[in-house]
A protein has these predicted regions:
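Membrane-water interface segments at the C-terminal ends of transmembrane alpha-helices
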Residues: 1-29, 38-136, 162-184, 189-191, ...
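Short alpha-helical segment immediately N-terminal to, or the first helix within
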Residues: 33-34, 134-135, 159, 204-205
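Short glycine/proline-centered loop/turn elements that form peptide/ligand docking sites
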Residues: 138-142
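Append "Primarily bacterial transcriptional regulators
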Residues: 145-146
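Glycine/proline-centered hinge or cleavage motifs at structural transition points of membrane proteins
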Residues: 149-150, 163
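Glycine-rich helix-loop "coupling/hinge" segments at transmembrane-helix boundaries
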Residues: 184-212
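Short cytosolic juxtamembrane segments of multi-pass membrane proteins
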Residues: 236-243
Length: 243
């Protein structure tokens, strides 16, 4: 049994623990510590605000889509889920360049609305899939019982469906928020200099600025945020009894 555990454990240590340790060591060097300043904080706040907007839009769009898929027959569910996943098979650069042709006539190209639209399009599947899993598990008899007791469809939705799908909502929000916060390809291609985000700055220090310590410091901030949000999610699951 121990021999079966060793390969995946070695993989995690080699490709996760060791790189993270190297990043942490470089982050606390002199060049790395210089990045913990007001400019970095302002960029983090700006990127967090953009990530929140994208996450909320993905939730607003993704919830009814996931509910519609969950209400379809098994055959149509497979077809619709395939359509949700298909965009992920396309390279992000190719997909983003194709979006330019749609955004330019609207005047959204090289503007923040275009960046948000591109990010929503790219990360919407990561919201739909966990929501679909949660909605599929909601017992229909509970909704019928709520309506039999006099609840309107809207009241039954907010009182029954939403609480039962909180795990999917939380998982979808984390799966969207964290990657958007660290994204750089879509903001750079669709927004230019007006849409520099936290991930763009990390990419700049590693690839253009050739300052691994500065890039490591910013990366460490992203890692810390990821761990904090993941820890908060599991804590909520425990305290609220989410399953």
């Amino acid at each position: 049994m121990k021999r079966l555990v060793f390969p995946p454990l070695a993989w995690l240590v080699l490709f996760l623990v060791v790189p993270t340790a190297i990043v942490a060591v470089q982050a606390f060097s002199l060049d790395g510590l210089k990045q913990f300043n007001g400019d970095t904080l302002r960029l983090l706040v700006k990127s967090t605000w953009i990530s929140l907007q994208v996450t909320v839009l993905c939730l607003v769009i993704g919830y009814p889509v996931a509910a519609f898929i969950a209400g379809c027959s098994p055959r149509w569910r497979r077809v619709l889920l395939l359509l949700v996943v298909v965009p992920l098979w396309t390279n992000v650069i190719v997909r983003t360049y194709s979006q330019i042709f749609l955004l330019r006539p609207l005047g959204w190209y090289l503007a923040m609305p275009g960046v948000i639209a591109g990010l929503v399009h790219g990360y919407l599947p990561f919201m739909i899939l966990p929501l679909y899993v949660s909605l599929e598990k909601v017992p229909r008899r509970l909704l019928e019982a709520a309506q039999d007791l006099g609840a309107s469809p809207a009241r039954a939705f907010w009182s029954v469906t939403v609480p039962l799908t909180l795990p999917g909502i939380a998982a979808g929000c984390i799966l969207v928020f964290i990657p958007v916060l660290g994204s750089f390809a879509v903001p750079e291609l669709l927004g230019g200099r007006e849409a520099v985000m936290f991930g763009s700055q990390v990419n700049y220090w590693f690839m253009t600025g050739r300052n691994a310590a500065a890039g490591s410091a910013l990366t460490l901030i992203l890692v810390a945020l990821t761990l904090a949000l993941t820890g908060l999610y599991y804590r909520l699951r425990k305290t609220e009894g989410l399953v």
